[in-house]
Amino acid sequence: MPKPINVRVTTMDAELEFAIQPNTTGKQLFDQVVKTVGLREVWFFGLQYVDSKGYSTWLKLNKKVTQQDVRKENPLQFKFRAKFFPEDVSEELIQEITQRLFFLQVKEAILNDEIYCPPETAVLLASYAVQSKYGDYNKEIHKLGYLANDRLLPQRVLEQHKLTKEQWEERIQNWHEEHRGMLREDSMMEYLKIAQDLEMYGVNYFEIKNKKGTELWLGVDALGLNIYEHDDKLTPKIGFPWSEIRNISFNDKKFVIKPIDKKAPDFVFYAPRLRINKRILALCMGNHELYMRRRKPDTIEVQQMKAQAREEKHQKQLERAQLENEKKKREIAEKEKERIEREKEELMERLRQIEEQTMKAQKELEEQTRRALELDQERKRAKEEAERLEKERRAAEEAKAALAKQAADQMKNQEQLAAELAEFTAKIALLEEAKKKKEEEASEWQHKAFAAQEDLEKTKEELKSVMSAPPPPPPPPVIPPTENEHDEHDENNAEASAELSSDGVMNHRSEEERVTETQKNERVKKQLQALSSELAQARDETKKTQNDVLHAENVKAGRGKYKTLRQIRQGNTKQRIDEFEAM
């Protein structure tokens, strides 16, 4: 029995290991991978490997793995990657696994600067990446530095601006807060919707020359073929939609494209190597097939996948709504518990205050009782003193009468008696004055005693009302694409041809009517403009790249991806081919 061959396949988020037989085909290995990851939208993907010469190449599905020029390692190394890109991610990427794989691959390409992304857009994209990883922003959990270990921005952007890690985090966090309530998978899709409007998204670039020998770039993407000047990969100069192309072929390094317009000449260019032409042909065929498929009614399989995806999304939304509802209920219960605890504390404090007031009133009552007793004693003393004085006065009166009688009887000792009389008269006057004072004093004590008695009665009434008040209520209880493939390594097979059919397709060039995602959202557009102005203040102009300069010129001229697409397809096919030859 032949010895099995170990194979390692790296997806964007996993490493898979298989043992295959020497006669296993590329398709059998591919099918094993997609089955393992649960992927049904297989037409976008392929298996990539590095050949014996160090070139990155796509595995042929119709050939045995062992018959292809895979670098000899143990295990054999492959990457599972998107080979073709959708025109509109929101319309075409159905399964969540497909969306995630595209999100991770596009994010890596942007961070590695394989796709040019301006700084302000890079910050917006980073915020969607953060939402997809961390979910909703929560200031209790996401403290300062929560993004310190995440790679979120291209190195070029970091080096061009005099901003600290904390300042970058603050800008990303501001947008992260705005994505509250967005599902993680929805944030990946929002990332892709912004990213697909970047000029270099989904484009495979190949160095070519026209008949004059001018060095140019050929861009092959989901919408057609575009020609770029050698120093500008951002702005295509001439475009040919797939619907204009009838046949593609190559002979050695010469590549020929025959337009549907019979009056137009062939579109001819030259690649540096035969293997490049083979790769261009395979990409053209795959992209053309997908371009035409999109413009036809969905197959039963795609319809079923879309229905299933809608059902799964609806179910997730229901689950999330239920979760949010439970969360709100829990928050309400916690708030109610806090409110009850607070009211309980307030009632306890009120009870404590009432107890203090009761004790204070009790002390005041005792003090007033003591004071009333003292006043009563004073009143009694004053009364006794007044009675004593009254007795003395009466005694003096009696003495006076006796003396008067004695004076009448004894005229002979008149002078002596007169003196005694005067003395007693003066004494009587003094005693009367003292009596009057004591009577006034007794009256005053009498008033004070009455006032104290009234205060005492009042305090007794207050104490009685406090003591008889009902106790505070207890707190309520807590409620808690057929592949016509060509072997890039087979140098003998130096020519090939493919017919590109456009039968049964309506509205060929609908892509020319598109606008970018930011143009659809005025608020995001203004935020991006504001952030762009802000970042410009911190930018080191000496570190600008060629792409930065080109992007700035495009923005200044009002050129967007789809506006440029409309412009480079203007005129008939012949005019554009003539323009290409003149470059």
Swiss-Prot record:
<dbReference type="InterPro" id="IPR046810">
    <property type="entry name" value="ERM_helical"/>
</dbReference>
<dbReference type="Pfam" id="PF00769">
    <property type="entry name" value="ERM_C"/>
</dbReference>
<dbReference type="GO" id="GO:0008360">
    <property type="term" value="P:regulation of cell shape"/>
</dbReference>
<dbReference type="InterPro" id="IPR018979">
    <property type="entry name" value="FERM_N"/>
</dbReference>
<feature type="compositionally biased region" description="Basic and acidic residues">
    <location>
        <begin position="455"/>
        <end position="464"/>
    </location>
</feature>
<keyword id="KW-0009">Actin-binding</keyword>
<dbReference type="InterPro" id="IPR019749">
    <property type="entry name" value="Band_41_domain"/>
</dbReference>
<dbReference type="GO" id="GO:0005902">
    <property type="term" value="C:microvillus"/>
</dbReference>
<dbReference type="GO" id="GO:0005886">
    <property type="term" value="C:plasma membrane"/>
</dbReference>
<feature type="compositionally biased region" description="Basic and acidic residues">
    <location>
        <begin position="436"/>
        <end position="447"/>
    </location>
</feature>
<feature type="binding site">
    <location>
        <position position="278"/>
    </location>
    <ligand>
        <name>a 1,2-diacyl-sn-glycero-3-phospho-(1D-myo-inositol)</name>
    </ligand>
</feature>
<dbReference type="InterPro" id="IPR019747">
    <property type="entry name" value="FERM_CS"/>
</dbReference>
<comment type="function">
    <text>Probably plays a crucial role in the binding of the barbed end of actin filaments to the plasma membrane.</text>
</comment>
<dbReference type="Pfam" id="PF09380">
    <property type="entry name" value="FERM_C"/>
</dbReference>
<dbReference type="InterPro" id="IPR008954">
    <property type="entry name" value="Moesin_tail_sf"/>
</dbReference>
<dbReference type="InterPro" id="IPR011174">
    <property type="entry name" value="ERM"/>
</dbReference>
<keyword id="KW-0963">Cytoplasm</keyword>
<dbReference type="GO" id="GO:0030175">
    <property type="term" value="C:filopodium"/>
</dbReference>
<dbReference type="InterPro" id="IPR011993">
    <property type="entry name" value="PH-like_dom_sf"/>
</dbReference>
<dbReference type="InterPro" id="IPR019748">
    <property type="entry name" value="FERM_central"/>
</dbReference>
<dbReference type="GO" id="GO:0051693">
    <property type="term" value="P:actin filament capping"/>
</dbReference>
<dbReference type="GO" id="GO:0045177">
    <property type="term" value="C:apical part of cell"/>
</dbReference>
<dbReference type="GO" id="GO:0003779">
    <property type="term" value="F:actin binding"/>
</dbReference>
<feature type="region of interest" description="Disordered">
    <location>
        <begin position="436"/>
        <end position="527"/>
    </location>
</feature>
<dbReference type="InterPro" id="IPR014352">
    <property type="entry name" value="FERM/acyl-CoA-bd_prot_sf"/>
</dbReference>
<dbReference type="Pfam" id="PF20492">
    <property type="entry name" value="ERM_helical"/>
</dbReference>
<dbReference type="InterPro" id="IPR000299">
    <property type="entry name" value="FERM_domain"/>
</dbReference>
<dbReference type="Pfam" id="PF00373">
    <property type="entry name" value="FERM_M"/>
</dbReference>
<dbReference type="GO" id="GO:1902115">
    <property type="term" value="P:regulation of organelle assembly"/>
</dbReference>
<dbReference type="InterPro" id="IPR011259">
    <property type="entry name" value="ERM_C_dom"/>
</dbReference>
<keyword id="KW-0206">Cytoskeleton</keyword>
<dbReference type="InterPro" id="IPR018980">
    <property type="entry name" value="FERM_PH-like_C"/>
</dbReference>
<dbReference type="InterPro" id="IPR035963">
    <property type="entry name" value="FERM_2"/>
</dbReference>
<dbReference type="GO" id="GO:2000643">
    <property type="term" value="P:positive regulation of early endosome to late endosome transport"/>
</dbReference>
<dbReference type="GO" id="GO:1902966">
    <property type="term" value="P:positive regulation of protein localization to early endosome"/>
</dbReference>
<dbReference type="InterPro" id="IPR000798">
    <property type="entry name" value="Ez/rad/moesin-like"/>
</dbReference>
<keyword id="KW-0117">Actin capping</keyword>
<dbReference type="GO" id="GO:0005856">
    <property type="term" value="C:cytoskeleton"/>
</dbReference>
<feature type="compositionally biased region" description="Basic and acidic residues">
    <location>
        <begin position="483"/>
        <end position="492"/>
    </location>
</feature>
<feature type="region of interest" description="Disordered">
    <location>
        <begin position="310"/>
        <end position="336"/>
    </location>
</feature>
<dbReference type="InterPro" id="IPR041789">
    <property type="entry name" value="ERM_FERM_C"/>
</dbReference>
<feature type="compositionally biased region" description="Pro residues">
    <location>
        <begin position="469"/>
        <end position="480"/>
    </location>
</feature>
